[in-house]
Amino acid sequence: VSLGALDDSVKAVKIDGAEATADNVKSGDYKVSRPFNIATKEGSESELAKDFISFILSKEGQAVVAENGYISDDNAEPFSGSNPSGKIVVGGSSSVSPLMEKLIEAYKENNPDAEIELQTTDSTTGMTSAIDGTYDIGMASRELKDTELSEGLKAQVIATDGIAVIVNKNNMIDELSSD
């Protein structure tokens, strides 16, 4: 289960002696993780899409990432956006969607004139819809495929998600090996 969605209803097991925590993923001690990517069609980004992406990658956007249990970029620069008005559609991965919802809320505090529609589907739909222009920004909880990149998508990692290996709370297993 996604580290950002982990709760007390299940038990996360250690992998190779490391607990599933953001700090352990960041340090490399816990190795089960995946990137959260956004992608745009190169050259087709609107001013609003560029400004929103700038916010996501900024110190303020990455604070939202960290607050929601994901691994952020500690070296992000402060946001210095232009707050353009308009509408964009962001869509794709159901794993990225809860974090994107929080990022949209935080961005709209700075830019209330922005209209950002969020559509939750899956990573492949997010990428194909960014390629065909249905989505201004696509979301994927994986690396982009070569075929997607060859269609003109430009990907950016917005967070790293630790994947907690879980068992029933009553299960005796506390640790597994990656071997």
What would you call each of these model-derived segments?
Residues 1-179:
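Exported/periplasmic ABC-transporter solute-binding proteins
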